[in-house]
């Protein structure tokens, strides 16, 4: 449905070239909810703006529904964009227009009749749960309601693709979840392809079936969400996964922690369990086999894309040799172990 083929985007500040995107290749199938995640400045918003050519790639091709947008004339591109809806972080509603009038705007610009506009807008407002807000102005809506209006407006032209640029970043957690639920419902009912840009792994976890991770303008990893969570190949992927299960080192431990082992100190480790290692009784096995005591400071587990994953902070009490053997045993059983320091 969407092919992003060897896309590069270069911005210039005077004579200085800034590579915002470098050789990006992605294929997004029809009906997929596809997430692109990255930190601020990673290039993800530039990428989504390239998909409908709000930003024209410096090189490469954007193919949507079999049509290479980079080869179209301005008139042809304008027509093609009608099949690509887009919503933004800050809604971009017209304050002087009511909810009904905001949603009707694309239809008015396309020359639809008044009867056709009313029928279409009424149906869209019902779909997004705002049938009772026809005559309300944006200033009297909550953030979540404004985003629902923006979604309805984006769907007015019956697009095949919906682009979401940080669509939940300005919303509180409960409202974010309601918008994600709405997007999932729209995807299911309309078989709509959704490309979603975010810096929040929780959003990807909550709605996406496929994900790509971008860092410094480059594609770092891509694949099914469950596979990325279960088998992250890069530190950037692990960083985003950890952000969904935030296990902070207690303050008193930080004060007593040293980077190197000293007399009377014991290793503080972070364990990342994915796939089969989540269900295996590895902690009890380690304690028995290596005669070591394990003090679990905190742990958390989640389930996504058919895969369990979890994090744990633990302190190992025993001889130095036993601790090293225990860590080696865990790593042999596909547990990622990081020694954070030593606590006296």
Swiss-Prot record:
An example molecular function term from Gene Ontology annotations: ATP binding
Q: Keyword Ion transport on this protein? A: no
Question: E.C. number, please?
Answer: 7.4.2.11
Q: Which Gene3D superfamilies match?
A: 3.30.70.260, P-loop containing nucleotide triphosphate hydrolases (3.40.50.300)
Q: List the disulfide bonds.
A: none
Task: Output the InterPro entries linked to this UniProt entry.
Answer: AAA+_ATPase (IPR003593), ABC_MetN_proteobac (IPR012692), ABC_transporter-like_ATP-bd (IPR003439), ABC_transporter-like_CS (IPR017871), ACT-like_dom_sf (IPR045865), MetN_ABC (IPR041701), MetN_ABC_transporter-like (IPR050086), NIL_domain (IPR018449)
Annotated membrane topology: Peripheral membrane protein
Q: Reaction catalysed?
A: L-methionine(out) + ATP + H2O = L-methionine(in) + ADP + phosphate + H(+); D-methionine(out) + ATP + H2O = D-methionine(in) + ADP + phosphate + H(+)
**Keyword set includes Transmembrane:** no
Domain ABC transporter as annotated: residue spans: 2-241
Give the binding site residues for ATP.
Answer: 38-45
Q: Name one Pfam family in it.
A: NIL
Q: Where in the cell is it found?
A: Cell inner membrane
Q: Name one GO cellular component term.
A: plasma membrane
Describe its assembly: The complex is composed of two ATP-binding proteins (MetN), two transmembrane proteins (MetI) and a solute-binding protein (MetQ).
Report the protein's function: Part of the ABC transporter complex MetNIQ involved in methionine import. Responsible for energy coupling to the transport system.
Q: What protein family is recorded?
A: Belongs to the ABC transporter superfamily. Methionine importer (TC 3.A.1.24) family.
Name of the protein in its database record: Methionine import ATP-binding protein MetN
Q: Mind giving the lineage of the organism this protein is from? A: Bacteria, Pseudomonadati, Pseudomonadota, Gammaproteobacteria, Vibrionales
